[in-house]
Regions:
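Conserved catalytic core of the tyrosine transesterase superfamily
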Residues: 1-280
C-alpha cells in the first residue's frame, strides 16, 4: 500500500464518519466497532470490489494501531473486523502448443541453452516449484528410474517423476555441466543447475531466463516459473489423471489446494462444449 492510497482510504473513511455523525470534527469515540462495521456495509453497498474493501480495512487497522500507540485508544476495533473473503483466482497456464514452443526455444549449441532446456523440461515434466528446482543436488537425481528426490514446503519430501524428454534434456545438461565446471575449475558444487560462475542458480535467475524465452516465442509475459507447475497439473487433469495422484505429484498437503485445477479443467470443458455443441 502506497502512502497516497493509504491517505485516500483514510480520508474516505473520515468523510463517511463525519456524514454519519453529522459533525465536522471527530474524536476517538467515533472510532467504534459499530461505526466501522457500518462503514464496511456501506462500502459493499456502493459496489466496491473485495480487494478495494480489504485494502481500505487494512488502512483502518493501521490507523487504529497508530492511535493505540499514541495512547488515544486502548483497543483497536478495526483489528477484530473480518474483511470480505477474497475470490480465488484460477491459475494461469499454457496450452500444449505454447508449452511445446517454449520447450523448443533454448538453443542446444551452448551450455546455457542445454541448461535452460533442462530447466524448462524439468519444471513442466515434474511440476516443481522453482525453489525446489534450484535446490536440487546431484544426489537427488535418478535418471535410470526417471525420478527426482524433492524437498518441498514444510520440509516435506516426495518423489517427482520425469518424462523421457526431461530425462534426455537432463542427461545432456549434466554432461555439459561437468565439462563447464571442469573448464572453470569449480567442480565442488553439488547443485544440479549452476550459473556462469559455477555456483548454484537462483530462483530469480530462473525467472529471468524464462522471460527471455517468453519474449522470444511471443508467449504471454505474465507467465512465471510457477506457471509451468500450473500447466503440469492442468494438463494431467485434462488427460484424465486422478486428482489424488496429482496431489501427491505436486506435494500438496491438502486436497483442496489441488482442486483449484479441476475448476480450470471444468471451465475449459464448458467453453469447448459451448463452442462445439449446436444447442449449447
Amino acid at each position: 500500500m502506497t502512502i497516497k492510497s493509504y491517505r485516500e482510504d483514510l480520508m474516505q473513511l473520515v468523510s463517511y464518519l463525519r456524514e454519519q455523525r453529522q459533525k465536522a470534527a471527530l474524536d476517538v469515540t467515533d472510532w467504534s466497532m459499530r461505526a466501522l462495521r457500518g462503514w464496511l456495509v456501506w462500502l459493499h453497498e456502493q459496489g466496491y470490489s473485495r480487494s478495494t474493501i480489504s485494502r481500505r480495512l487494512a488502512a483502518a487497522r493501521a490507523f487504529g494501531r497508530f492511535l493505540c500507540r499514541q495512547g488515544a485508544l486502548q483497543v483497536n476495533p478495526a483489528q477484530s473486523l473480518r474483511g470480505p473473503r477474497q475470490e480465488r483466482k484460477l491459475p494461469h497456464f499454457l496450452t500444449q502448443e505454447q508449452i511445446h514452443q517454449l520447450l523448443q526455444a533454448p538453443f542446444p549449441g551452448t551450455w546455457q541453452g542445454l541448461r535452460d532446456r533442462a530447466i524448462l523440461e524439468v519444471l513442466y515434466s515434474a511440476g516443481l516449484r522453482v525453489s525446489e528446482l534450484v535446490g536440487l543436488d546431484l544426489d537427488d537425481i535418478d535418471l535410470r528410474e526417471g525420478f527426482l528426490h524433492v524437498r518441498g514446503k514444510g520440509k516435506r519430501e516426495r518423489l517427482a517423476l520425469l518424462g523421457p524428454a526431461a530425462q534426455q534434456a537432463l542427461t545432456e545438461w549434466l554432461a555439459a555441466r561437468e565439462a563447464f565446471l571442469q573448464q572453470r575449475r569449480t567442480c565442488g558444487t553439488p547443485a544440479v543447475f549452476v550459473n556462469r560462475f559455477g555456483t548454484r542458480l537462483s530462483s530469480r535467475s530462473v525467472g529471468r531466463l524464462l522471460h527471455t524465452y517468453l519474449r522470444q516465442t511471443g508467449i504471454d509475459t505474465r507467465t512465471s516459473p510457477h506457471t509451468l507447475r500450473h500447466t503440469f497439473a492442468t494438463h494431467l487433469l485434462d488427460a484424465g489423471a486422478d486428482i489424488r495422484g496429482v496431489q501427491e505429484l505436486l506435494g500438496h498437503k491438502q486436497l483442496t489446494t489441488t482442486q483449484i485445477y479441476t475448476h480450470v479443467s471444468t471451465r475449459r470443458l464448458r467453453d469447448s462444449y459451448r463452442q462445439a455443441h449446436p444447442r449449447a
